[in-house]
């Protein structure tokens, strides 16, 4: 290696390979908006099934609210119904009581991300999805920009990424569902036709209903995780993550069935 060229090669290596990665992901099977645990699980199972999937998260560190456990006590709880997913991701766990298992939140989040990428998913951090591509009354892709551009209020146009299916995994805010309903005057598959808004905490009901609410909420647009709770008006559940994991797997299964 020419030592006088290493500085240039460092920059060129980053720029050229990143450009190639972005170009490869301009036309997707599935675009996942939001980098929380439900979306990451979906990315893993979709990629494992051979679908072309990319996940977009506005934060520098994807993982949603899983990193901090509860009130920065970095432990999380998962019920037995979701333990098979924990095992598939090779996460260490310990039985705490009947039906409940505890694990380290940092290990758990890291494992989800690692496994998703190694299954073939691409994760783009520092990306905000500000809109969707809406063609022939079908959600057909996402409109992306750098997070700092939006935070600074800079007038910079975004880029478009096409996708056969889009997953709203944006958590409590259910941003994609709100945007699609507000801007296009359409009816979502909810009791009101719009985002209902999540209810206050109830662990049992919240865990059941987040999975029940995971579905195609509008042609081309799917919803999972806390976004599913917010859209359908079901309770939040706090730092128990079985429902999040099961929701991610369910939305992946629905899309795999549709596209495969």
Question: Model segments located where?
Answer:
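N-terminal glycine-rich dinucleotide-binding loop that anchors FAD/FMN and/or NAD(P) in oxidoreductases
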Residues: 68-92
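A conserved FAD-binding loop/helix module that cradles the flavin
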Residues: 231-259
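Short FAD-binding loop at a beta-strand-to-alpha-helix junction that anchors the flavin cofactor
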Residues: 215-235
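Flavin (primarily FAD) binding-site architecture
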Residues: 168-184
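Glycine-rich FAD pyrophosphate-binding loop
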Residues: 47-67
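Extreme N-terminal leader/targeting segments of oxidoreductases
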Residues: 1-29, 195, 199-203, 227-232
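N-terminal Rossmann-like FAD-binding beta1-loop-alpha1 element of flavoenzymes
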Residues: 25-54, 244, 251-252, 256
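Feature captures the FAD/FMN-dependent oxidoreductase FAD-binding
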Residues: 85, 90-169
